Swiss-Prot record:
Organism: Schizophyllum commune
Compartments (UniProt record): Nucleus
Residue range(s) of DNA binding per entry: 147-206
Disulphide connectivity of cysteines: none
Gene3D superfamilies: Homeodomain-like
Compositionally biased residues, Low complexity: 669-687, 699-724
Name of the molecule in the record: Mating-type protein A-alpha Y3
Cellular component terms (Gene Ontology): nucleus
Record-linked SMART domains: HOX (SM00389)
Amino acid sequence: MVDRLKLLQAISTSAKDLASFALSRGASPIPQPVGLTDVTFDPLPLPDLNALHRRLKDAGLPPKTTKSAIKAYDEACSRWRSTVDESFKATASAVSPRNLHLLLSLRHHVYAQQVQKWLWQVLQVPELWKAEMAKQRAHITATMDTYKKPRPKFHSEYTPLLELYFHFNAYPTFADRRMLAEKTGMQTRQITVWFQNHRRRAKGPLPRMAPTDKIPMEEFERQRENMARKLLPVLLPSHLRPAPSGSENASPARSIPRATMSAAKSKKPDGDKEALRKVGKKALRDAAKTAKANSSTVLGALVAAGVQQAPEAKNSKKAKKAARKNAQDVEMRDATKSHEKRRKTKAMPRPAGQVPMDVDGRAHKKSTKTTSSAFDSKAELAFARMAYPAPSPYAWVHTAPKSSHVMPSAPFKDAHISDIRKLGKGKPSQNLTSTPATFSTVPPRRTSSRLNAMRPPYAFPATYDSASVPMTFAAAQTLRFSFVTDSQAFGFRQRYPLSVGEKVHSGAIDALTRRFESLRVLCAEFSTPKKQTSSFERQTLCRLRAEGLKAGEIEVRHLVAADSYAARRAITYVTPRAPLDSVVVDLPRALQLRLVKPLVPAEPIVRPDDFAPFVALAEKRAKRRARKEKKKQAEKEARKEEKRARKEAKQAKKDRKEQRAGLPRRSPSTLDSSRASSVTSDASATSRKSRTSRKPRDSSASSVASARTPSLSSTSSRRSSGTSMPATPRMNESLPVVASDNFVLGTDKDVTMTPELMAQLFGEDDASGLDEPMQSEGFSPDMLIFSSCNDGALGDMTADVNMPELGDLSDTQLSFDDMNWTSSMDLSTQPAASFDSSSETSSMDFNWLLPQCANTAPDWSALIGMTPSTTSQIHVLGGTYSCELGGTNTTNAPLNFADLSFELDAGEDCFINFDHNPLGGTMLAV
């Protein structure tokens, strides 16, 4: 490119040099060709004003406006015609003859384009004029107020009906107001305003019913009868109305016509009563006829009902039937009330010859009882998610019209149309051999419980659009899939069929064919025996499983037979040239001939999700159940807290009572341990006994027994005392060991332990064994328990010994404690270490005790078995300590108890540290 540019610059420079050289030699430039001076143009066409006038007139434009519009259009076209002629004549002088035809065509095009634009603007004048006139009329109507909408008439004869309804419900629902408006012939707004005004004028509490409540029909009939009695004197004819209250000569026979009375008087005296009774019947029949003639209104219906109940005499059966036929125009019934069951008379047995023969089983009628549609929410949710794992954007259910699908062939007509018609209807089918995608779980619409006040159970977000749902799968046979398509709804144009001999090879179509053949193999796996399946098909099936069709889905396919679930996940087909309903029998051939076009949309297209309301309902039920469980758990925790608070208050009250009685005060650690032991004992007791079979304990014994020192060493003492071991304390809790200062009885003198005091302090079990000699258990290394891990490391060490009573107690008191190691081992009395209140910790050496066990010291290798090499833990009196073990491999050295020394915390009464402890040549560092 750079070389070409340099070459062009050189050529331009050479041309300029040649031109300057020619001018210097006296050469003259070539003159320009002179244009045509006498160019004549054809006249431009004039606009058709007559046709424009007819079109404006037909559009409804007034003559004056039409004339002005056409005039303006004609003037504009004339000005534009003269302008174009002048401009093109000036331009034609500089145009060569060979380009003249281009100039003429350009002149005609410029003129016609502008004229056509003005013509379109003129044709828009009628619409603009109509819009402007409508706006002006609206403005005039709004400002002058000359037009008033006729006010709807209020039918006052239906006021008693509204008042009767107001007596039961002052706040009707929209469905009730609409029903009342239809019955009374008024607008819903009128009914709403009437109830608003009536509520404003009413006094006292107003009745309000829920939409699902029932109207008490007995009370309704009673109120209707009372209203009829009140309105009866007003609506009766003049000769049947009762006399005024001020008239003294008023009599029941006053309203009877004179001719009827004279006829009655002419009878014999014995028949006076019979004649009067007949005359009264006739008068009442006339009143009933009058009321029946006016029964088109509510008051007429009320009067008719009141007149029918007026006669006291018994009517015949014909009269009763006629009275039943007089139905009311406005009738309020309880829609939820079940029909009254008639008493069934037992049929008498017929002779054997008269019993009809039941040939085809018609006598055994199926039960018409509807089963409950309630399902387990978890099962519903699991089944719906298994059938449709991916949420569908088409979350509404539709029902296909009867005439929208017509099958072309008879073999698949019934099966396919039955599947299509089941969309959006009924409950989920229990038949697992059918396709779950063709059944809907949406229940039918429920009927209203009172005046159609209930709304439909599901709200559909949008109507069904066939263009957004291009395809529906349905399994016609095991190896045949039918595709319901609509070419016009997809936006495909009609395509002409290719020749039969023409073959099209495409990589996408071949891949699609192979995938469909794989699906066919998958369907054929369960339809044919495994022995007949070829090795190629088995390999294809294994590859399908590796591609994502898992064993669970194959098992589901085995249950629901060969449906289109896997095919829908794999490929999607659209048939542009196919009729509305087509069955693709040979899919590979159809793909090769392009009878079926593969569609690869941006998102997977599926049919409308029949299970969407099903899944939503199941999720809603699951959430509701979770909320209930959470609420129940919260209530349970609240009850536990309340019970714990009551128990603590009861325990505090008991402690105050013991303190007033002079009993020793317990420390918080003892209180915690006693509560833990009581909780454990309660838990163990509930499994052995029921609450009703428990015997009440003595309050003093139970309160004192809960305060005794818990046992950590002796199993026999736990059995004798009847108390269970307390729970193991955590790292941040103190050990349940009781110091001697907790047993101060209020005096400085020694207290002699008597059986009564022993029973108060430690329970009746220990008091009963007070006089018995104590068995010397003897201290042995068995109280120190060692355990090793799998790799030979020291797992843990548990010291099952009891803390001594450290304090100012006498030897006699120590001898009575069955858990005291001093008296049980028959050792010399060790002087108790006095704890100074100012010192935090003190150290006690147990060297005087350990030589007693020198002869019974076990071998280290027997205790551990292998060389310790890892980090372990040691548990001493409920406390856990981490130890790093390491050293030589000499494990034959005996365990020397003389090197064990413990450090005690005086305030917490627990072990806090070990000193250097060589265990078999292994140093123990804490």
